Amino acid sequence: MKKQFITEGVKYMLISTFCFTVMQALIKYLPQDQISTIEQTFFRSFITTVFCLVFMLKNHITFAIKNVKLILIRSLIGTVSMFSFFYILPRMPLGSSVTIKYLSPVFTALFAVMMLKEKLKPLQWVYILIAFTGVMLLKGFDNRIAFTDLLIGLISAISGGLLYIILRQIGDDDHPFVVVFYFMLIASFISGLAMIPYWVTPDLKDSLVFLGVGFFGFVAQIYMTKAFQEKDDANYLAQFKYLEAAYAIIIGYLWFHESYTILSFLGIIFIFISLILTIRLKSKEKIKLTVEND
């Protein structure tokens, strides 16, 4: 019987990373001198909440939750991660901001060892290092990145890494739409209160952009939640977030005419090598386990 190399969790992550990149590009496209980061956070959260609400009502999905504490923690950490990332998006090239944020798989691997008691094989550490090297090559040491912005980006990466672990702990006890709905609802409430002093009414074009941000954010969030509720190891799935950096390099070049070097494309190759090796290692482990249990 032919074994499946690409799991459902991986498929969900591929969809999620692409949609997140489109959402980020739309945020960067907004007039940053007029619309504040906190207002961007509000519209992204609120519109996604509406999408979730409509879908849940249409499909008769219950609003009841089992892991109240974990979902609350997930929502608060997710809000911090989202705001800090939206803050750095307009302040540096798209590829650079996404690169910094998606150091989160490194933190996920560390949190997985500490919190989920998952064990990393020596080869997995090597593959993480290859991916990390690829991310660094994508933009190198960019002098356009301020130290303060770098720190805020790292906050987003660390909180994002912890976020995946919490989703793994929630598991499939709660429906993915329920998890996303309460995250977006809480984020809307927090950012809605905070944005009152900075409110600027968006025009028609900006409103349409916000609608796109909410839609792509909704799809990305759902598929990321579904991915981490699968049975794959958290550190395995998290490495696919590196693809987002590659997507961002391409979109940044085509849409925002951002300049990149040969090292950037070499970095993309490193990332794909890491992902392919990770998939092969995981597939071999599954085949071995199946044979041993036959």
PLM ranges: what are they?
Residues 17, 21-22, 53, 75, ...:
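Hydrophobic/small/kink-forming positions within alpha-helical transmembrane segments
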Residues 21, 28-29, 37, 52, ...:
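Transmembrane alpha-helical segments that form core, pore/gating elements
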Residues 90, 104-126, 246-265:
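C-terminal transmembrane-helix exit sites in multi-pass transporters
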Residues 123-139, 263-282:
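Hydrophobic transmembrane alpha-helices of multi-pass small-molecule transport proteins
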